[in-house]
Swiss-Prot record:
Protein residues bound to heme b: H63, H92
Effect on the protein of changing F41Y: In beta-B chain
Cited Pfam families: Globin
Superkingdom: Eukaryota
Domain annotation Globin: ranges: 2-147
Family: Belongs to the globin family.
Naturally occurring in which organism (per UniProt): Cyprinus carpio (Common carp)
One GO molecular-function entry: heme binding
Protein name as it appears in the record: Hemoglobin subunit beta-A/B
Expressed in which tissues: Red blood cells.
Subunit comment: Heterotetramer of two alpha chains and two beta chains.
Length: 147
């Protein structure tokens, strides 16, 4: 993947404004609420019976922060995302048996949450374009083991 200077700047600037203690948990909770079939991969997390239960679930929040940590690693090494995510791809494919389409669903929820936080001025079409390109590269890296 080739990144323009403008794309790199937009992604890094947006990331610098995000609070990983908020975005990750919020995006994962949104994914579990909006796409309830994704909950089957989180059965060990306890009460996921309602949106309020999901939003208040500490295990969901903790895993959301883990997701954000993974994104941080990708941002720090944007030219090597496939290698960065290779072990995660193997784990999600071979150990956890996660449906690879769920990565895209979560990426969409991350985008929605970022857009809601920053609004049209902070999440302009140019920023969105760069951010979605970045998340698409991450999703494809996570799906790599499935092919």
């Amino acid at each position: 993947v080739e990144w323009t200077d403008a794309e790199r700047s937009a992604i890094i600037a947006l990331w610098g404004k995000l609070n990983p203690d908020e975005l990750g948990p919020e995006a994962l909770a949104r994914c579990l609420i909006v796409y309830p079939w994704t909950q089957r991969f989180f059965a060990s997390y306890g009460n996921l019976s309602s949106p309020a239960a999901i939003m208040g679930n500490p295990k969901v929040a903790a895993h959301g922060r883990t997701v954000e940590g993974g994104l941080m690693r990708a941002i720090k090494d944007m030219d090597n995302i496939k290698a960065t995510y290779a072990p995660l791809s193997v784990m999600h494919s071979e150990k956890l048996h996660v449906d690879p389409d769920n990565f895209r669903l979560l990426a969409d929820c991350i985008t929605v949450c970022a857009a809601m936080k920053f609004g049209p001025s902070g999440f302009s079409p140019n920023v969105q374009e760069a951010w979605q390109k970045f998340l698409s590269v991450v999703v494809n890296a996570l799906k790599r083991q499935y092919h």
